[in-house]
């Protein structure tokens, strides 16, 4: 499940700060009006067990999360939550989807949901919208058929995002499993170039054309 809230606190701009804890991870970034956007993803079973013996409680889970990662707990205790409560979402489908459904070209999360730790979902949605516009432009100018529209968009979408989605799911599997994450981080610390390589292959590092 995912949780999100806005805070007021100290956090350097221009960077995404990532904290891990057993069964999940939490990301922070500075946004407009001097606020900090805090989002986290956690396994449903981890959330439930951390909220016991009382009914599942977000606030109780946040306390538990801070105890698992002292650096994260220290930041949260020194920051002011602006939102009245945490926004939550569950049953997040990180599964393969159809890019064209009933002759409708899908974009954004409707086409494929990338793991937050590894991707720029909004950027992908904008890029897919541009791709759909380009393909439909060819159809409207009678250069390709309706069948070609479906085939071209699907092929272009998977060529652009397919590997990125698969790699993001592997990375997220490591992030949600402590027994995998610790040795994985040790390898990345020993080989810094590996981290840069992962960033390059999970995001579009090229400028979007006008």
Please tell me what each predicted stretch does.
Residues 134-210:
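C-terminal helical "tail/cap" subdomain of flavin- and related membrane-associated enzymes
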Residues 52-136:
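FAD/FMN-dependent oxidoreductases across multiple families
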Residues 12, 23-26, 30, 36, ...:
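Short capping/connector residues at structural and topological boundaries
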Residues 1-67:
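Conserved FAD-binding catalytic core of PHBH/FMO-like flavoproteins
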Residues 19-21, 25, 89, 199-205:
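A general structural signal for short secondary-structure boundary/capping elements
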């Amino acid at each position: 499940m995912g949780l999100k809230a806005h805070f007021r606190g100290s956090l350097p701009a221009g960077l995404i700060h990532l904290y891990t804890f057993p069964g999940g991870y939490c990301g922070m970034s500075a946004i407009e009006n001097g606020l900090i956007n805090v989002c986290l993803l956690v396994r449903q079973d981890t959330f439930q067990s951390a909220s016991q013996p009382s009914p599942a409680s977000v606030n109780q889970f946040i306390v538990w999360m801070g105890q698992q990662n002292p650096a994260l707990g220290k930041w949260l205790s020194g920051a002011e939550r602006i939102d009245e409560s945490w926004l939550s979402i569950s049953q997040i489908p990180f599964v393969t989807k159809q890019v064209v459904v009933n002759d409708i070209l899908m974009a954004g999360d409707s086409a494929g949901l990338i793991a937050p730790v590894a991707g720029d979902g909004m950027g992908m949605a904008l890029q897919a919208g541009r791709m759909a516009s380009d393909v439909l432009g060819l159809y409207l100018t009678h250069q390709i058929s309706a069948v070609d529209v479906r085939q071209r968009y699907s092929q272009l979408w998977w060529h652009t995002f397919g590997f990125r989605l698969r790699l993001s799911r592997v990375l997220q599997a490591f992030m949600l499993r402590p027994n995998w994450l610790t040795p994985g981080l040790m390898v990345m610390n020993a080989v810094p170039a590996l981290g840069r390589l992962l960033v390059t292959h999970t995001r579009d590092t090229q400028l979007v054309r006008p």
